[in-house]
Regions:
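N-terminal pre-Walker A segment at the start of P-loop NTPase domains
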Residues: 98-123
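Residue-level preference for the first positions of well-ordered beta-strands
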Residues: 127-131, 158, 189, 221
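A short, basic N-terminal segment
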Residues: 1-104, 265-280
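Walker B catalytic acidic pair
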Residues: 194-195
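Walker A/P-loop nucleotide-binding motif
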Residues: 124-144
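Short glycine-rich substrate-engagement loop in P-loop NTPases that contacts/grips substrate
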Residues: 108-117, 148-189, 199-206
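Active-site donor-binding loop signature of nucleotide-sugar glycosyltransferases
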Residues: 61, 105, 163, 257-259
């Protein structure tokens, strides 16, 4: 049987010398590019144990190359993670473009979105959400999408959907309604877009309440966008709506959206562009 130190010696790789490398005055191999050692001496009390007096070491350029490779690998893993979160979190590919970077800077409420992302840990701990309410086309969904995209870039899981899709999924699910709702509540942040546009049947209202109440009991924040007014939410027409609206107002801070209709402006811009093309 070989002595243990011989086996240890075999595990120490030899340094590969490049043509430009050289031996320094201390007897160690130096990199010809960065002029730093590619070897280092063992402490005197370890040299006999390992059967040799030196071991490989990273020169400065090798260290820089390794760190560059590690950073590139880390960035690749981050991109893959974010891509997976967006694939799972968004119900419409267009939502990927609803970002702070693409914002036109004309929505005065955008500061509330930045605040939410910057204080996410506090929002999560306090179970604080937003109720984004106001007229059609004022940027509510876009702002909610900005929050979702920004948090996903931080590798935080978000689900952005609407009750029309949820009700369709519940009607078609084979896993059970409770399990489906539980899956929604596993997301650190749930965003419900276009609330109030779903069909108001007894079954539909019951499922809407189940989702919102389950989210409430999960202790996780919720963001909702709606065209309903705050007065309509505070003074509901009947008991089923009152149960739902009370839960929302308890969980979410109201944020009013008013002003210009960005969708109408976008449509007008397209019409003007079409007229210009036809006249060219």
């Amino acid at each position: 049987m070989k002595p243990a130190f011989e086996d240890m010696n075999l595990q120490i790789p030899a340094v590969t010398a490049e043509p430009e490398d050289y031996t320094g005055e201390d007897g160690l191999l130096y990199c010809g590019k960065c002029r730093t050692p590619k070897e280092a001496y063992f402490p005197a009390d370890k040299a006999t144990l390992f059967g040799r007096d030196r071991h490989p070491a990273e020169c400065d350029c090798q260290r820089a190359q390794r760190m560059e490779r590690e950073a590139a690998e880390q960035q690749r893993k981050h991109r893959d993670k974010v891509e997976e979160l967006k694939r799972r979190g968004f119900t419409d590919p267009a939502m990927r473009e609803w970002t702070f970077a693409n914002d036109n800077g004309r929505n005065p409420q955008m500061k509330t979105a930045h605040f939410y992302v910057e204080h996410w840990e506090d929002m999560k701990a306090g179970n604080i959400g937003y109720l984004l309410w106001g007229s059609v086309g004022t940027g509510k969904s876009y702002l909610a999408g900005c929050i979702a995209n920004a948090l996903m870039e931080k590798e935080i899981s978000v689900r952005m959907t609407n009750f029309a899709l949820i009700l369709n999924d519940l009607a078609a699910t084979f896993e059970g309604k409770n399990e489906y709702i539980s899956n929604l509540c596993r997301y650190p942040l749930l965003i419900l877009d276009d609330f109030g546009m779903e069909r108001g049947t007894e079954y539909g209202l019951e499922q809407v309440y189940n989702v919102i109440d389950s989210r409430y009991r999960s202790g996780k924040p919720l963001i909702v966008t709606t065209n309903l007014t705050l007065t309509e939410l505070q003074d509901p027409q009947d008991t089923p709506h009152a149960r739902i609206y009370d839960r929302l107002l308890e969980m979410c801070a109201p944020v009013c959206f008013s002003g210009e209709n960005f969708r109408r402006e976008s449509a007008q811009n397209k019409l003007n562009r079409l007229k210009q093309l036809m006249n060219d």
